[in-house]
From Swiss-Prot:
InterPro entries: Virion_mem_poxvirus_L1. One of its GO terms (cellular component) is membrane. Belongs to the IIV-6 118L/458R family. Its main location: membrane. It is found in: Membrane. This is Putative myristoylated protein 118L. Keywords: Lipoprotein, Membrane, Myristate, Transmembrane, Transmembrane helix. The chain crosses the membrane at residues 188-208, 214-234, 482-502. It comes from Invertebrate iridescent virus 6.
């Protein structure tokens, strides 16, 4: 399952970027002096390019597209798309087995966004491929609508795969999700293989079957016991779905009355899942706002289960909060309500490791309960109730020179009206990848802002709120598939062994030799 999770992450990030890229292309209105994505020349009169599948004959400037994707509106839209799609990766997990559902999902979304950032800000910017739509000899506006850029997926996917392979967090998240996956038949288990090898080893080697009259019947008995255990021994698990728009009693596909279940006040969806799993009469549960309803000794229709497994239940969570960047000629203090701080005196970079500052919940911004604190700065490590390091912590320094200024903002330094050699500008448009610019003298005279290093900033604060969203779950009873394989293996060994020990094969060979 680990490989499938990684491939799903690659696919969802690729799909989100391609989808948004195509939206950028579809809504592009290029004129003579606006050619972010398209190259349009000598226009006079309106030109509409519509209804085409653009492949070999038309290309897009990948650098221009990267810049378009990273403007504020497109970037927010892309992050929300990725967050929404990432929820599908954990759909159907057993919440009772997931150590920390909130942190796992938040980390998954954050990692996907980090992969997206590397793709759109580094890989695509360095891609030499240019996909241009060239329109000549026209005047007026040019509208490009209802076109499909099929080459985008191939170019973008290679960038996403490279970014994903270099992301260390993805491996940890994959392992966590894999452990929470509902059990399925995995094929031959090591225990089953070992038992078969032992059974075969007892028969002897080199055609000597000492004690076969005792051993092989025992092997056959073992086969029978394995068959019986296979049909009688089941494993009970709960397949859970979070972020649901409608609970079981709210869904028209389920036709279940809430009054038909047993209500219970319980703190989280995970606890509700565990309680249902431990009750053999519980076939399904729903949970919302601290209250669970358990449905027992009843049949849940396939249309109800399909409603959730097919994804029609999804809501609009999670929330990705826009980070607040502030600055001042001093170090930050606790009363400074922000996520990041630049000391303009010494160039030090500070992060507030308490995301409760201005975190979105309940329809407003405020502070979340203390026990749900996370340390998102530089890695998104969950710290639970540990207060160490909560608050402002220095993350690093941008290396400010004496008697020179340093500043930051949401975009490149072209907005600065006055600058001097050695000044530094930090672009926090993408909070997780901060771009550092230095004002330098260029050969031949004049000065330019030179883009230098890209350093790790602070990742997005994601409030997936898994265990506080609506949740439902279904009881699943699965058989130990390896027992079936063991029974079949022992049966084969026992039958063949009995045949050898009875001399069946030797009698046939003797009969042939006499003829």
């Amino acid at each position: 399952m680990g490989a499938s999770i990684s491939s799903n992450v690659t696919k969802l990030v690729t799909d989100a970027i391609v989808r948004t890229s195509n939206e950028v292309v579809q809504t592009a209105h290029a004129t003579n002096n606006q050619s972010i994505v398209f190259d349009v020349k000598n226009t006079s009169g309106d030109v509409v390019i519509s209804g085409n599948t653009i492949r070999q004959t038309a290309t897009i400037n990948m650098v221009g597209l990267s810049q378009a994707l990273n403007n504020s509106d497109n970037n927010i839209k892309l992050d929300q798309q990725i967050a929404q799609m990432a929820k599908a990766v954990i759909s159907g997990l057993n919440l009772a087995q997931l150590a920390d559902a909130n942190n796992t999902v938040d980390s998954l979304i954050k990692t996907c966004i980090e992969i997206k950032n590397v793709t759109t800000q580094q890989c695509m910017m360095n891609t030499s491929q240019k996909i241009n739509v060239l329109v000549e000899g026209t005047k007026g506006n040019v509208s490009i609508v209802n076109n499909e850029i099929s080459q985008l997926a191939t170019s973008i996917q290679s960038c996403v795969e490279k970014a994903a392979s270099n992301n260390k967090n993805l491996q940890d998240i994959t392992s966590s999700i894999q452990q929470a996956a509902t059990s399925e038949a995995k094929g031959l288990s090591l225990a089953m293989i070992a038992l078969i090898i032992v059974a075969m080893g007892l028969t002897g080697v080199g055609g000597v079957y000492a004690g076969g009259k005792i051993i092989f019947p025992a092997v056959l008995i073992g086969s029978i016991v394995s068959f019986v255990l296979y049909f009688q021994w089941t494993v009970r698990e709960i397949s859970s779905y979070s972020f649901v728009q409608n609970t079981l009693s709210e869904s028209a596909d389920c036709s279940i009355q809430k009054s038909s279940g047993e209500s219970d006040n319980i703190g989280s969806a995970k606890s509700a899942s565990e309680k249902c799993q431990n009750d053999n009469t519980c076939v399904a549960y729903e949970w919302q706002n601290g209250q669970a309803v358990y449905y027992k000794n009843m049949t849940i229709g396939n249309s109800c289960k399909s409603y959730y497994s097919n994804g029609a239940h999804k809501d609009t969570l999670p929330v990705i909060k826009k980070l607040i960047f502030q600055k001042g000629a001093r170090n930050p203090v606790n009363t400074d309500v922000a996520n990041a701080w630049l000391n303009t005196l010494d160039g030090s970079f500070w992060v507030n490791s308490d995301p409760n500052v201005l975190k979105y919940f309940g329809g407003r911004y405020g502070r979340l309960p203390y026990q749900t604190r996370y340390l998102y700065a530089s890695g998104g490590t969950y710290v639970g109730d540990d207060v160490n390091g909560v608050g402002w912590n220095q993350q690093g320094s941008f290396g400010k020179r004496a008697n020179r200024t340093i500043d930051w903002g949401d975009g490149p330094p072209s907005t600065i009206t006055s600058q001097a050699e050695g000044d530094i500008w930090v672009d926090y448009h993408d909070p997780s990848l901060l771009k550092v610019y230095t004002y330098i003298a260029q050969q031949g005279g004049g000065f330019i802002w030179q883009s230098g290093q890209i350093i790790k900033g602070i990742g997005p604060i994601v409030n997936s709120n898994v265990e506080n969203s609506k949740s439902v779950g279904f009881a699943i009873e699965s058989k130990k598939q390896w027992l079936l394989y063991l029974a079949i293996g022992l049966l084969i060994v026992g039958v063949i062994g009995m045949a050898f020990s009875s001399g069946m094969f030797s009698k046939k060979n003797n009969g042939k030799s006499k003829q």
